[in-house]
């Protein structure tokens, strides 16, 4: 509600309401608002804004303003001057409005703020206490405890928790409190405290009821705290209590106002007990009448809502009944009926205290017999117990209500001496006991009822029950249990219990096989006796136990086993010396039964531990073997029951057996799920003595895994052996399964373990990183030279021809990633050694991703490397000096320990060193670079000349030369080049192989001179010729073909590849070319030998040299020497070779990219001789294995050859057709002969028929899948630029094999037709065009997967393009309408627009050619409606035809429509339209083909040519010929094809018009 605005008469009103300081304070919404002048006089603008907000109607705004005000008061010392008298006057008025808000938060905040002001201002606020204290105390009387309790607590704190001061408030402000109550009760109502414009009637009533209920409670507390309140303020009290506003709260019609109702009941009670009502009869009469009337409001509909208040009503009536011996009942003539009806309804839902209150009312009214004992009270009690029996005992507070009922009912029954009452009580007791609800847990009720009858009575009833008919026992559910509970509770019951025990034993002995099924209570009763302290039963129990082995049967085992287990844990067992014998006898019998072992072992587990141990030692039972056998075959199908509690048969031996059983049966998950129930000792044994941790941790579900780790960690903290084992398992799994998704799990566990067991850090963090690296990387894979920046320099260190173990490499990478992530969590453990290790492994990732068939870019995600960490000196000059002279340690890039380290580690570290130098060289000036060159020259010279130089020294030299080769100081570089070249002159082959090849490797690094002059020669010509002679000598030696020469051969290939790029060298003569070509020819020949060392590198080096030589030949115009043909033959042979070490990786990609470039540079004629071989290899997977790049290369070449050969075949075919046409009329036989020679290859068709992928692309082998699509791509290549006749042959061939529809079905099944997001990202060219080598020979599954998806779309597009109307036939025959709709949506969105655009582009490109020859012809294209219109202007009239391309073309055929005709007959016009349509639907022609036929027919028609008398067209739709056959009789002309068709269909050669014979030669 809003407090805005000022009442017009407010300023003239002298009544201050609740105010005492000159301003009116009121609870209503229209009066008592702060004067604007007062608000404007507030000290600060902040306070003005707060009060302005408090006058708003929005409750959220008020709440925020109160919070701001509270903050100001909290900082009272800073803002004390804000809170002056003007502020308090304004607040006193606003406060009265806020406490009636519907928002409890606002009410509570306003009370808290006022109390804060009282506490902070102290004496300064004293004159305002009369305004504030009544409202505060009203807040403590709210029925909503979330407001009243905090308010009372705040008030108590304000007065230092002094109860005397709080009580004094009620006396000191008695008058003001009564005035407040009077204001609320007498002056205010629903209409005054709520503005009807903004509040509904229900909201207004609820608000007023809440306020007046608080006022009533305030009045009650006023009476409680002030004994003289009625004397000092009698007039005010009378006004308040005479007003009906309070008594209107005695209304229970809707059942929503019970709190206010009960508050008024308390008021009546206080007024009566304090003597106020007896002295004010009018008020008492008014209250009682309202009270009695309210009894009629209670009905069966609202009883559940009002039942909590019923005891208060009854207790009040009982209290008021004391007034003048029941005079209150005379205040209402129908009071008796109202009370009886009230009791009748209220007994249906009694609450705690109800029956006590009923009995209190009965006790107070029985002296004047307000209600008759037998006619009214007795039926009430009887119906109440019946209702309770029907309702059941499981409801809330049912035990308390039941006990309360029987306590009062039994007291009520004692007032009668009549026998019928006693019988009724007995009957109702037994009815309650047999109502189907168990009373065994209701202790107080049992005590109440057990004393009603002697124990013998209960015992006889039990025996009678068991001897009664089964039907009766079924009806009386829980009856015997209730009787038994009362018997054992009743006093002096020993003899009765003894008789009952004998009775039960007799029942068992009489029918041992059926007794427990027949009598449910026998088993529970016997167990109760065994668990009790009834020592007097010892003899009987012992005797019974001794008999059990003779009584037990397989069907009753569970019951007797339960009794025996209970007995073993009871006091009676220790009192019986022969008890153990009885147990042995029992289990001997039990083991003879065909019972599951879990059942018998469950019984043993329940036995007393000492007794169990005695049984285990028994030779007659052999329990150890029994348990061992059980463990071996345990199935974990009992939710781990055997683990629960203190399991007796689990020990260090059996738990191991159980674990091995779980592993053998694949039930480790189930085993782990129940480990939390296992004893710690056994769990430790499991962890230490088995491989459980490595087998289970991270191999089970996430939840189970986390629980397993927590359990293991807890034990690890106290056991270093377990801690180390846990650490090793975490590390092992991180090495195998570490990934960004699993990173957090491994790291979190490692950190928790290190924090709990610090010693385990040495397992995670390597003490000797180089040793760890060497363990996983024992050798350098020679293939690294193909993918690393060091290239052939790799061979300066010892390399291995055998491929490295990629799994070990991957483990090392994952370990480093794990270590890197661990350092993020534990940054204090970062040091240079670990950073160096991680950096080296990060370099290793490059090799892994290039060599692996499944690269992972996420492996590059290292954080703690030299490049990111920043704790290592990366200054270029310092690093160069460090390389020349390694440091002893510190932050140097190269230290002695690294320089002396394992060669594999050193190799990858050198690559890191090279990268660091490469990254920093750009920041180095030329002067600095040239200044360092002298020391580099000295280092290289020393290394080359010193026989003791190591391989590592040479590799460091190579790195420095690669760097300084960029220097502009030519003299020093030339000097080094000359030095290295001189090392090669005149050396013997053995020296070369052993040592000097390293000089050649270093020299190669100085031959990369990208900006050299054209005539520049890197080595002096004389010296170069001397080197050539040495090389020639090496190549002529026998050693040249030995494995030891392999490295030299690679370096020589690299040498000539770089050297022959210089024009100056090429101009020196043919010696360099001849030598290069000879080396190349020999090397290519060696590529064909499987056991050639470094084969994959050799083949790539050969291609590099060939490419360089090819460029040299083209530039110089020189002819290739004698080796030319041999080289090309060997290059072609490379396509067919299967390399054993070949993998679908980056190495393969690089090679086949080069090979494709080389092969495609050759003339296609040179490959024609290989056509059949390529065809056979492509179709025979065994020849190329799983090498997808080889398949890709050969397939793309085959496609080119198919197109090339088809051009010649088409010409040959058409020539033969023409010859055949002129030779014979009936040419059908020879047709078949001609066609059989020009069909699609049968082997190719067989391939696409037999090798259809069985699974969806996502699950199919990607290489096999794309090969299948390539076969189809080859088939469709035959259609490229072919003739109409051959196209029809191909289509018919595919149709006969059923391949067209099958492929359509396959594609639409494989494509996710609803995955529109993917296809929206695909460019239209990727659908309309496809290049087999378009993916740059990427062999990876992800790339091939995406390529397959796009190729499926392209193949569908090509099929649509080439098979014409067969597309529509296939689509229309799809029976699954959902699939049909999905296909249509997909095609319409992604393929049809391309096909339609192609048709329009085709017409656009040739439109000028069509219209230029005929001015009367006009062609119009409408890209919006996808329509083509062609019109002829004839005598100012149009002859027009249209071609409508549907949105889902080609699923629906193009429609040819005759728009308007002129100058020809309708029959001829229709025939033209049909012929035009036939070109598209029958001949798979395009719109342009159809349009050309139509325009030519029109042109010829109006040029005077005669049409065919059969088809009415001038040009034949198929062969485009004029009518050339004439009937000699009627002279009509016919197309040869039309007439031939007529002859075949009619069976003779007569004219279709005149029927005369026509002699016809086709």
Swiss-Prot record:
- Stored Gene3D superfamilies: Zinc/RING finger domain, C3HC4 (zinc finger) (3.30.40.10)
Segments spanning the bilayer are none
Quaternary context: Component of the ribosome quality control complex (RQC), composed of the E3 ubiquitin ligase RKR1/LTN1, RQC1 and RQC2, as well as CDC48 and its ubiquitin-binding cofactors associated with the 60S ribosomal subunits.
Pathway(s) this gene product operates in, as recorded in its UniProt entry = Protein modification; protein ubiquitination
* Annotated protein name in UniProt: E3 ubiquitin-protein ligase listerin
Consequence of substituting residue 61 to A: Reduced binding to stalled 60S ribosomal subunits
What's the gene?
RKR1
Its keywords, alphabetically, are: Cytoplasm, Metal-binding, Nucleus, Repeat, Transferase, Ubl conjugation pathway, Zinc, Zinc-finger
Keyword Membrane in annotation: no
UniProt cross-references to SUPFAM superfamilies, sorted A to Z: ARM repeat (SSF48371), RING/U-box (SSF57850)
